[in-house]
Amino acid sequence: MSRIFISYRRDDSAGFAGRLADGLEAALGAGGVFRDVDDIRPGEDFQAAIRHHLENVDAVLVMIGPRWLAAGAAGGRRLDDAGDFVRMEIATALASGKPVIPVLVGGATMPAEADLPAPLAGLARRQAVVLSDDSWSADLARLAAALGARASARSAATLGVRRWLPLPGQPPGAPGRRSS
């Protein structure tokens, strides 16, 4: 199962999302990144697939480009539409308590809380990462290191770290019994 979920708008940051996915796969290992166009099979219910992957990842990266808040074909902002997939992805991730990391690309700036619909307001309080063309490799390396450290910490917590407790009457560090 993928460890990282990339949420993006195709008409805003698809190229950046693909480049990021490739870089993270190289850094974190094959199969570590979920991106819809790469990981949803033809004929599969994409809404169910997205929800399934969101439930099983360690972190969600929200790609924010210059047109991320722009209006859709109907004229209103897409994020204001409850059926917008980007909105659904972010709201689901925020509600689950998963780490949600805004990734600013193409010179985009972080949206203010007032610019976001209520279910997404928490996104504005997340520390963002900037990926720029001028320093892509260094920016990607920092992000990959942070994601790798986060996943390692989660794995250790999930597996449970066992300590050895000394038997009664034994000094600390002496052979003892396991504690969970």
Give the label of every model feature segment.
Residues 124-125:
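A short helix-turn-beta junction within AAA+ P-loop NTPase domains corresponding to the substrate/partner-engaging
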Residues 66-70, 107-110:
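Short, charged/polar surface micro-motifs in flexible loops or helix N-caps
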Residues 108-121:
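Glycine-rich, charge-decorated loop segments at or immediately adjacent to ligand/cofactor-binding or catalytic sites
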Residues 1-67, 73-76, 82, 86, ...:
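Conserved N-terminal substructure of TIR/SEFIR domains
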Residues 100-103:
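Conserved beta-strand/loop subsegment of P-loop NTPase cores
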Residues 128-132:
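Short acidic-hydrophobic, aromatic-tinged amphipathic segments that line or gate anion-handling sites
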Residues 161-180:
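C-terminal or otherwise distal, non-catalytic regulatory regions appended to signaling enzyme catalytic cores
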Residues 150-163:
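Juxtacatalytic C-terminal regulatory tail of Ser/Thr protein kinases
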